[in-house]
Amino acid sequence: MLLGVNIDHIAVLRQARMVNDPDLLEAAFIAAKHGDQITLHVREDRRHAQDFDLENIIKFCKSPINLECALNDEILNLALKLKPHRVTLVPEKREELTTEGGLCLNHAKLKQSIEKLQNANIEVSLFINPSLEDIEKSKILKAQFIELHTGHYANLHNALFSNISHTAFALKELGQDKKTLQTQFEKELQNLELCAKKGTELGLKVAAGHGLNYKNVKLIVKIKEICELNIGQSIVARSVFTGLKNAILEMKELIKDEKTSH
């Protein structure tokens, strides 16, 4: 199973002071050396990663570059110009802290955007909610890749296996009793397994991402149809204490151990 290292949160730290430190390109070099892919989200408002970040990373890094972006003409044209290995199309709201859900597959521009990117020899992935309907639509749209949104799984795991429900970060919608949460958690995990199998059956390559960390990744790794995980915030958070190289290698070890032991 491959690890795409999302380095957005390195850019978050840089933009907090609007300086050149930490250097996103240096982070990309470390991610390229110890991970399998660099993932970067260039948002419409450029609140974190900037155009020059993407340009420099594509120019100087040999690893595959996975650009996450919305259906925004300016950024899509940037992708067509710079030609990352892959573009993952994601939904985007200006007020959100992080991507809140899967892409709406009924968007009028979606099919045309996919065709333009593929005609430029750029692989296209769709970041979708884990539903059979969205997987079938992704196949109809002729995407090569799908990335299953694991946010709900991650939130349920947090509610069950951490103290988050007793903190300011508790989610009101997950304020149920443990038994109910456990049932929902098992159902969501089964749904991810079913969706990954369906995607593979349809000839789609299947990735997963959002909210994955060192504690909840193990069960996802057991889903053999998933070939890639894109993980960012938890790796960058761990790197504050261990360094980026060690944080990436620790996640790689978790993925390797789970895959080889099952």
Curated annotation (Swiss-Prot):
Superkingdom of source: Bacteria
Q: Which residues bind 3-amino-2-oxopropyl phosphate?
A: 6, 17, 211, 232-233
Tell me which Gene Ontology terms the entry assigns under biological process.
pyridoxine biosynthetic process
Which Gene3D superfamilies does the annotation name? Aldolase class I
Query: According to the UniProt record, what class of enzyme is this?
Result: transferase
Its localization reads: Cytoplasm
Q: Which CDD domains match?
A: PNPsynthase
Active site per database record: 41, 68, 210
Give the pathway listed in the UniProt entry for this protein.
Cofactor biosynthesis; pyridoxine 5'-phosphate biosynthesis; pyridoxine 5'-phosphate from D-erythrose 4-phosphate: step 5/5
Naming one, the record's GO cellular component terms include:
cytosol
Tell me which residues bind 1-deoxy-D-xylulose 5-phosphate. 8-9, 43, 48, 98
Q: Which GO terms describe its molecular function?
A: pyridoxine 5'-phosphate synthase activity
- InterPro entries in the record: Aldolase_TIM, PyrdxlP_synth_PdxJ, Pyridoxine-5'_phos_synth
- Ribosomal protein among keywords: no
Q: Where is this site: Transition state stabilizer?
A: 147
Q: Which keywords are on file for this protein?
A: Cytoplasm, Pyridoxine biosynthesis, Transferase
Q: What is its EC number?
A: 2.6.99.2
Reactions catalysed, as given in the entry: 3-amino-2-oxopropyl phosphate + 1-deoxy-D-xylulose 5-phosphate = pyridoxine 5'-phosphate + phosphate + 2 H2O + H(+)
Q: What does this protein do?
A: Catalyzes the complicated ring closure reaction between the two acyclic compounds 1-deoxy-D-xylulose-5-phosphate (DXP) and 3-amino-2-oxopropyl phosphate (1-amino-acetone-3-phosphate or AAP) to form pyridoxine 5'-phosphate (PNP) and inorganic phosphate.
Family, as annotated:
Belongs to the PNP synthase family.
Could you give the subunit structure recorded for this chain?
Homooctamer; tetramer of dimers.
Q: How is this protein named in the record?
A: Pyridoxine 5'-phosphate synthase
**What lineage, starting at the top, does this entry show?**
Bacteria, Pseudomonadati, Campylobacterota, Epsilonproteobacteria, Campylobacterales
